[in-house]
Amino acid sequence: MNRAAAYAANAPLMGVPGASAPPGGIGEWFRGAGGLRLRAAFWTPSTLVAKKPRGTVIVSPGRTEPIEKYYEVIGNFLARGWCVLAHDWRGQGLSARLLPDRLKGHARAVEEFLDDYARLLDAWEARAPKPWIMVGHSMGGTLNLMTLEGGESRFAGAVLSSPMLRIKTGKRSMWSVKLAVRWNLRHGKAGDYVLDDADDPFDHTFEKDALTSDESRYEQWRQQLYACPHLAVGGPTWGWLAFALDAGERSLKPKALKTVRIPVAIVQAAEDDRVWKQTNKWAAKRLGRGRYVEIPGAKHEIIMEADDMRAVFLEEFDAMGAYVSPVEDLSPVAVPPAPEPVSQPEPDEAA
């Protein structure tokens, strides 16, 4: 298949029994910054709560996460009458990887990710009905916030799940981590694993590694990962860590936060061991129309949490939806059974 045909072909959406792609969706390739092949998927609701779709929810996953991990919440949005556009960031999912070793979670520069996101919006603007609601988790939430700070005006509201505005560094001080990052980048080790820790995702267990308290959702995602190992991403590189620190610092500038004019809800896990909840609360207070909601007992991956905790996130989404696209009847409707999973693709080549 030549390069033009590869972009024209539909991108696969993977699945396993019980966790297949919601109906009404099509996976597609698009070109990111530098011509990189990236994957996105667009869904139209099969049942409406109004005479037409209420708008579009644009979903941005966190580090390591592909579109497939968000099937359940995509189904929730569809049941509420929204179109959904979800995407794989560069370096993860079925988007092009940045290093020959596909398991390395790598990044080069914040600007590449922001450019990719702008190209995503441009590519689907004609098809994605407005108003648009931005939904981003962790790394995705930070990049979403930076997009708004950069002047993006096509969104009517945003709901961010535990955004990665300031990462936790364990027993190491932030100062020592930044020093280690600078040293490794200076010595050409940007593509090496942080502390040589590959963090093989296939060795993870619920007891040791889960970022949710819901074991059934965790195991369902594990089944998806084993069915399509090309989706897997391991530990971060020094380059990714430099990117994460840079994105967090830039997103937290008070002047930048004040420029965001749309309503933004930050929904934060109380038991988060990946990001500082205090920082996210601080940021919410400095947004022009920010709201901070903390979920007691929740771990980092709120959208994968137990039903009662997920319900808090969905309530915040519904409140945002009612504000930007009010309808008389907001009762969710059932999503029809999903189709059978598609076959596994060949892995994409590294850029």
Give the positions of each predicted feature.
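Short alpha-helix in the alpha/beta-hydrolase fold that links the catalytic acid
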Residues: 262, 276-285
